[in-house]
Amino acid sequence: MAAAAATAATKGNGGGSGRVGAGDSSGARKKKGPGPVATAYLVIYNVVMTAGWLVIAVGLVRAYLAKGSYHSLYYSIERPLKFFQTGALLEILHCAIGIVPSSVVLTSFQVMSRVFLIWAVTHSVKEVQSEDSVLLFVIAWTITEIIRYSFYTFSLLNHLPYIIKWARYTLFIVLYPMGVTGELLTIYAALPFVRQAGLYSISLPNKYNFSFDYHAFLILIMISYIPLFPQLYFHMIHQRRKVLSHTEEHKKFE
């Protein structure tokens, strides 16, 4: 579940649309890119997703200017947030049919972790929707996704501005911890309401002889951040050094 905030930075190594140009300098990958029809589709997909997250960003700014407060801004962008984040499920299909050379399993984990947070936590536990922690991860996701989908679009067009590449491999240093903090605080805020309502929990006895405690499940998800966060974060730091140093070396030779 820690991948929910790391998606933007880790997906470039496998998991979304336009992964061919996601910072990998492997000549083999570039030669084995998608065909013209698939490339055109991926460009359109990434342009639409970039525009969608820009709509969310503009919605946040407009709501803030209208209210004069950052509290409860979630309600102003709830629908587009759900729509475009759920739209990322197509990225799993892209990997499954082979137009993007990424792991279906890894991509599924990354995408579903965010979809889970949006629908199974924020949507299902309405009491947390006014929490500032929701705004924290929404802002982190919004900036991240605008950069990520822009990165994929320009990469597919073989015209990637350095500023976008730099932003993709630099801003996560702040955005990843910011997103993770927002996610954890949101899940934590949901716990008492989940327990009180028995949300998504299954008690014994029942004909299937099966029980499930959603409250305990959310706690396990929070605990999973402890080993996953540092591993993913330092992996991304390593990727940043590798990708940006390679770019600088390439510029010197030019």
UniProtKB/Swiss-Prot annotation:
<feature type="transmembrane region" description="Helical">
    <location>
        <begin position="108"/>
        <end position="125"/>
    </location>
</feature>
<keyword id="KW-0256">Endoplasmic reticulum</keyword>
<keyword id="KW-0275">Fatty acid biosynthesis</keyword>
<keyword id="KW-0456">Lyase</keyword>
<dbReference type="GO" id="GO:0005789">
    <property type="term" value="C:endoplasmic reticulum membrane"/>
</dbReference>
<dbReference type="GO" id="GO:0042761">
    <property type="term" value="P:very long-chain fatty acid biosynthetic process"/>
</dbReference>
<feature type="transmembrane region" description="Helical">
    <location>
        <begin position="80"/>
        <end position="97"/>
    </location>
</feature>
<dbReference type="Pfam" id="PF04387">
    <property type="entry name" value="PTPLA"/>
</dbReference>
<keyword id="KW-1133">Transmembrane helix</keyword>
<keyword id="KW-0472">Membrane</keyword>
<dbReference type="GO" id="GO:0019899">
    <property type="term" value="F:enzyme binding"/>
</dbReference>
<comment type="similarity">
    <text>Belongs to the very long-chain fatty acids dehydratase HACD family.</text>
</comment>
<feature type="modified residue" description="N-acetylalanine">
    <location>
        <position position="2"/>
    </location>
</feature>
<feature type="compositionally biased region" description="Low complexity">
    <location>
        <begin position="1"/>
        <end position="10"/>
    </location>
</feature>
<feature type="active site">
    <location>
        <position position="183"/>
    </location>
</feature>
<dbReference type="GO" id="GO:0102158">
    <property type="term" value="F:very-long-chain (3R)-3-hydroxyacyl-CoA dehydratase activity"/>
</dbReference>
<dbReference type="GO" id="GO:0005783">
    <property type="term" value="C:endoplasmic reticulum"/>
</dbReference>
<keyword id="KW-0325">Glycoprotein</keyword>
<feature type="topological domain" description="Cytoplasmic">
    <location>
        <begin position="2"/>
        <end position="41"/>
    </location>
</feature>
<feature type="transmembrane region" description="Helical">
    <location>
        <begin position="170"/>
        <end position="187"/>
    </location>
</feature>
<feature type="compositionally biased region" description="Gly residues">
    <location>
        <begin position="12"/>
        <end position="21"/>
    </location>
</feature>
<comment type="subunit">
    <text>May interact with enzymes of the ELO family (including ELOVL1); with those enzymes that mediate condensation, the first of the four steps of the reaction cycle responsible for fatty acids elongation, may be part of a larger fatty acids elongase complex. Interacts with BCAP31. Interacts with TECR.</text>
</comment>
<feature type="topological domain" description="Cytoplasmic">
    <location>
        <begin position="236"/>
        <end position="254"/>
    </location>
</feature>
<keyword id="KW-0276">Fatty acid metabolism</keyword>
<comment type="function">
    <text>Catalyzes the third of the very long-chain fatty acids (VLCFA) elongation four-step cycle (condensation, reduction, dehydration, and reduction). This endoplasmic reticulum-elongation process is characterized by the addition of two carbons to the lipid chain through each cycle. This enzyme catalyzes the dehydration of the 3-hydroxyacyl-CoA intermediate into trans-2,3-enoyl-CoA, within each cycle of elongation. Therefore, it participates in the production of various VLCFAs involved in multiple biological processes as precursors of membrane lipids and lipid mediators.</text>
</comment>
<dbReference type="GO" id="GO:0030497">
    <property type="term" value="P:fatty acid elongation"/>
</dbReference>
<comment type="pathway">
    <text>Lipid metabolism; fatty acid biosynthesis.</text>
</comment>
<feature type="topological domain" description="Lumenal">
    <location>
        <begin position="61"/>
        <end position="79"/>
    </location>
</feature>
<feature type="region of interest" description="May be involved in interaction with TECR">
    <location>
        <begin position="198"/>
        <end position="214"/>
    </location>
</feature>
<feature type="transmembrane region" description="Helical">
    <location>
        <begin position="218"/>
        <end position="235"/>
    </location>
</feature>
<keyword id="KW-0007">Acetylation</keyword>
<feature type="active site">
    <location>
        <position position="176"/>
    </location>
</feature>
<feature type="glycosylation site" description="N-linked (GlcNAc...) asparagine">
    <location>
        <position position="209"/>
    </location>
</feature>
<feature type="topological domain" description="Cytoplasmic">
    <location>
        <begin position="98"/>
        <end position="107"/>
    </location>
</feature>
<dbReference type="InterPro" id="IPR007482">
    <property type="entry name" value="Tyr_Pase-like_PTPLA"/>
</dbReference>
<feature type="topological domain" description="Cytoplasmic">
    <location>
        <begin position="147"/>
        <end position="169"/>
    </location>
</feature>
<protein>
    <recommendedName>
        <fullName>Very-long-chain (3R)-3-hydroxyacyl-CoA dehydratase 2</fullName>
        <ecNumber>4.2.1.134</ecNumber>
    </recommendedName>
</protein>
<keyword id="KW-0443">Lipid metabolism</keyword>
<feature type="transmembrane region" description="Helical">
    <location>
        <begin position="42"/>
        <end position="60"/>
    </location>
</feature>
<keyword id="KW-0444">Lipid biosynthesis</keyword>
<feature type="topological domain" description="Lumenal">
    <location>
        <begin position="188"/>
        <end position="217"/>
    </location>
</feature>
<keyword id="KW-0812">Transmembrane</keyword>
